[in-house]
Amino acid sequence: MSGNTLGTLFCVTNFGESHGPAIGCVVDGCPPGLPLEAADIQAELDRRRPGTSRHVTQRQEADQVEILSGVYEGVTTGTPIGLLIRNTDARSKDYSNIADTFRPGHADFAYWRKYGVRDPRGGGRSSARLTAPTVAAGAIAKKWLASQFGVRVRGYMSQLGPIAIPFSSWDDVPGNAFYAPNAAVVPELEAYMDQLRRDGDSVGARIEVVAEGLPAGWGEPIYDRLDADIAHAMMGLNAVKGVSLGAGFESIAQRGSEHGDEITPEGFASNHAGGVLGGISTGQPITVSLAIKPTSSIRVERRSVNRAGEPVMVQTLGRHDPCVGIRATPIAEALLALVLIDHALRQRAQCGG
């Protein structure tokens, strides 16, 4: 396999390039009988769509999904579901000045060294544009998990660059472009991003994703651990450089008497484990944190080399996200849902649950 498919029983194969005719995915293994229409998927795609605020790329893509197969009379048939999203606003000329050079921090150098050829238009296969099919597939996973188990997957931004965002309310999350759970912080975030765009620079972010309502018992020991698969999937999201569950790296400073979640007849007293022990879900909420690096396509000139290995100065023009973390929340939600539905089906196959 070439690393374009995620999942064991619920499999998603992603295809396309940023400036190609279309992008999409094939979802194989979706159980039959799930009510599904394009509107179910479109609602999630609209949350990720570019051009929705001044703080993200101004590329205007409608991201209208087309269901090509696997659905008949409004329900899934159990056969592969083909999903297509056409690219309509690519401006390939914006990349002519970097066609033979490499952006510091970008995958274009690694792609060229691996394949010996690269598509410089919008980053080609390495573009965050390719997260749209992931969100589309995740919408199906979310709907099945909710209908079968009442599982809810949602997320928010907890930090933008140097600005920490204290959690206030889930109700605040959909009301701003940042998916910030605290409306009072939004003006500060907007001012920071406005200055960042004027500087021609970029910044990173931290995203939190939470899955609630799943039962205990999902996951496998050793190599197919639930938390390992979550980390594997999340690292497939563009610009993610770190993944942790529960207390994560804070566990280093904790003592065992603090970190171990005490168990009472009413349930767990805390959730430092992030909902997973020994690679298997505990029934607690699964909590995942992502560290997202700054965008590498910036207007600030930086040193690099061209394909001949000669030193050059690189400046990236065109339309780019100054912080890819702003649109990352629905993508991270989709990835978590895809891992969970896969393990739910594996649990049902092995243990009948």
Curated annotation (Swiss-Prot):
<dbReference type="GO" id="GO:0010181">
    <property type="term" value="F:FMN binding"/>
</dbReference>
<dbReference type="GO" id="GO:0008652">
    <property type="term" value="P:amino acid biosynthetic process"/>
</dbReference>
<keyword id="KW-0521">NADP</keyword>
<dbReference type="GO" id="GO:0009073">
    <property type="term" value="P:aromatic amino acid family biosynthetic process"/>
</dbReference>
<feature type="binding site">
    <location>
        <position position="319"/>
    </location>
    <ligand>
        <name>FMN</name>
    </ligand>
</feature>
<feature type="binding site">
    <location>
        <position position="278"/>
    </location>
    <ligand>
        <name>FMN</name>
    </ligand>
</feature>
<comment type="subunit">
    <text>Homotetramer.</text>
</comment>
<keyword id="KW-0028">Amino-acid biosynthesis</keyword>
<comment type="similarity">
    <text>Belongs to the chorismate synthase family.</text>
</comment>
<keyword id="KW-0288">FMN</keyword>
<dbReference type="GO" id="GO:0004107">
    <property type="term" value="F:chorismate synthase activity"/>
</dbReference>
<feature type="binding site">
    <location>
        <begin position="125"/>
        <end position="127"/>
    </location>
    <ligand>
        <name>FMN</name>
    </ligand>
</feature>
<dbReference type="InterPro" id="IPR000453">
    <property type="entry name" value="Chorismate_synth"/>
</dbReference>
<feature type="binding site">
    <location>
        <begin position="293"/>
        <end position="297"/>
    </location>
    <ligand>
        <name>FMN</name>
    </ligand>
</feature>
<dbReference type="GO" id="GO:0005829">
    <property type="term" value="C:cytosol"/>
</dbReference>
<keyword id="KW-0057">Aromatic amino acid biosynthesis</keyword>
<keyword id="KW-0274">FAD</keyword>
<feature type="binding site">
    <location>
        <position position="48"/>
    </location>
    <ligand>
        <name>NADP(+)</name>
    </ligand>
</feature>
<feature type="binding site">
    <location>
        <position position="54"/>
    </location>
    <ligand>
        <name>NADP(+)</name>
    </ligand>
</feature>
<keyword id="KW-0456">Lyase</keyword>
<comment type="function">
    <text>This reaction introduces a second double bond into the aromatic ring system.</text>
</comment>
<dbReference type="GO" id="GO:0009423">
    <property type="term" value="P:chorismate biosynthetic process"/>
</dbReference>
<dbReference type="InterPro" id="IPR035904">
    <property type="entry name" value="Chorismate_synth_AroC_sf"/>
</dbReference>
<keyword id="KW-0285">Flavoprotein</keyword>
<comment type="pathway">
    <text>Metabolic intermediate biosynthesis; chorismate biosynthesis; chorismate from D-erythrose 4-phosphate and phosphoenolpyruvate: step 7/7.</text>
</comment>
<feature type="binding site">
    <location>
        <begin position="238"/>
        <end position="239"/>
    </location>
    <ligand>
        <name>FMN</name>
    </ligand>
</feature>
<dbReference type="Pfam" id="PF01264">
    <property type="entry name" value="Chorismate_synt"/>
</dbReference>
<protein>
    <recommendedName>
        <fullName>Chorismate synthase</fullName>
        <ecNumber>4.2.3.5</ecNumber>
    </recommendedName>
</protein>
<dbReference type="InterPro" id="IPR020541">
    <property type="entry name" value="Chorismate_synthase_CS"/>
</dbReference>
